[in-house]
Every structure is written in structure tokens, then in C-alpha cells.
Amino acid sequence: MKSSKYSYSKINLFNSCSLKYKFLYVDKNYKKDEGIEAFLGKLIHETLEWIYKKKIEENKTYYSLDSIINFYKEAWNDNWHYKILKYKYIKRKKADYFTSGVNFLVKYYQIFGPRFNQNVYKVEEKIEFDLGGYTIKAIIDRIDREGPNKIHIIDYKTGKKMLSDKEMKEDMQMGIYGLGLSSIFPETNEIMLSHYYLATNQFVSVNLSDVDTESFSDGLIENIQEIEKTESEETYVANESKLCNWCYYWKECPVKNGSTPSEYMR
């Protein structure tokens, strides 16, 4: 077993920009900077985790909408910090993002509240599994048991862009989740993988049986081997894209100058 552990976020960062991967995972150049979209998404995840965790651990059977919004508001205020950024050409203000979160939760409550009777089994579940001698780790937003041998993996999304069915079958993150749970629960004969988009309250789902898991596994191993080769040869490359506008490493990057075109929010 190789010593390094790999996650979707680690592999995906390498694929998007291997130089940024170096700054974060090799140089350990950690920064407190955080995009407002990521901050909002994190707090929505925390609020939904709170709902279902209390249901699982305390058998809570009823929630008022006020209690949910209050939890979200307190989490927002407690976690807000001076290193939160937004792309400077976006006109939305701090209050606009906060209100977006409230709207997500209100709509979610209208569909699933006040009792939230889904068959939720685990929330924010940490998993690790072996793939070709590599340790793959992940944190799954939610796992539902929808029958004695059926598992439903749900990943919350606060962005507007929805994947197509074809894109879901090829999605690395969901593929990792599916492989992980199929190895942890080998008796399970059906694993459903879903994105739940809070902006539209829609599922986009694919059954793991419809995913070419052998090809996916081979591709993931090749991806990790490419990372190892790049680390060994130190051949990191800056990949310029629109994602640079949200990058916190402009001062360190040889193809950029000065500060990121994002600005701190107040």
C-alpha cells in the first residue's frame, strides 16, 4: 500500500492546475482565503447536516422553519471572516449571498419539511478504500438506505450548472463515492448516485450499474500515476483558465502578476 492518500478534490485540483496543486499539497502553502460561493455552499451543507444528524442521533421528528433559518444565520455569523472573496465584476453583495442561502433552505423545507422523512442512514460520512494499491478517501454528504440492498448517495450542489445524464456517468466525484460504497457494502446490489441542486430542487441521478466502473477505475489509477510522475520530476505547469479569477496564488504564480481580480467582501 502506498503511503499517499488521494481524494476527489486533490486529484481534481491537479487536473485543473498542477502548479496550484504544488502550492497547496507539496509546498503546504495554506491560505485562509475562501470564495464566497464556497463559503455559502459550506454553510448550506452544515445546515442540512444538522437537520439529518439530529434526526439520526436524537430521533427528532419535527423542525420549524425558523429553527433551521436561525441555525444557518448563526453559522453564517460565526464563520464569516475577513478573507472571503468574490470576483470583483460580480455585483452581488454579502447580503445577497446570505439571502440566496435562506431561499435554498425555504424551498427545501417546503418540499421535505417539517419532518424530513427520508431514510437517511449517514451524513458527512468519511470513507476510505483501496484502489490498485492507492488509498482513496472521501466525505459523502448523505447516504440513504432505500431498501435492504439499495443505497442512495446524495451530493448537495448550490451552483446553478446541472450535469447531464452522460456527465453524471463520467463524474469523478460520484464515481469515487460509488466505488467506495460498493467496496464497503459488497452485499448492496443497487447504488444510486445523485446530485441534488438546491437552486432548482432537482435530482440528477445515475445508477452505478450504468457506469463503466472498470474503465473509471483504470482511468483514476492512471491519473494518480500521472500525479506521482509529476511530483517525482517536478514538472508542474500553470494552466490558465477562467478559474484563475478565483485563485489565491497570483503572487506565487509565474504567469500572473500582482493580486487576484477577486476582492475581499465586507
Roles of regions detected by a PLM:
Residues 29-37, 207, 231-240:
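Short, solvent-exposed helix-loop connector elements
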Residues 47-123:
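A non-catalytic, helix-rich entry segment at domain boundaries
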Residues 213-250:
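Polybasic (Lys/Arg-rich)
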Residues 31-32, 259-266:
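Short cysteine/histidine-rich metal-coordination sites, predominantly Zn2+-binding motifs
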Residues 11-12, 16-56, 98, 102, ...:
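Nuclease catalytic cores
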Residues 118-120, 125-222:
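Mg2+/Mn2+-dependent nuclease catalytic core
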Residues 20, 250, 256:
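Cys/His-rich metal-chelating microdomains
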Residues 16, 246, 255:
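Short, cysteine/histidine-rich loop/knuckle motifs that typically chelate Zn2+
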